[in-house]
Amino acid sequence: MRRTTFVGLVPLLLLLVTGEATAHAFLDHAEPRVGNKVDAAPREVTLWFTQKLEPAFSTIAVTNAAGQRIDTGKARVSGNQMSVSVRPGGTGTYRVNWHVLSVDTHTTDGDFTFQVGQ
């Protein structure tokens, strides 16, 4: 009876372990928040992901309403967090584009917008 119980648990344990190992880094939340309206342009955009990131292969680009890139350069990555400094870009819709490589070697990307001063 004990052998049957153990054999029955093995597939369940494998499913749990491989489910975590194959997870990708998806956007968990951001500051400024996705779709939010803020009074003034932020000095920094920060994204948090569901997995740790590989710094050398993870990027953020921030553009203002005129489509001009206003981030100041390379993203800073620490664990599952990525941020970039932003120059003032006026009012309107800002777009954040991101591309990340998680430590599980899978890439994900996406974008979102937020409003400044409208």
PLM segments and residue spans:
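Short, surface-exposed alpha-helix to beta-strand junction/turn motifs within ectodomains of secreted
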Residues: 45-47, 51-70
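Short strand-edge motifs at loop-to-beta-strand transitions and within beta-strands
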Residues: 80-84
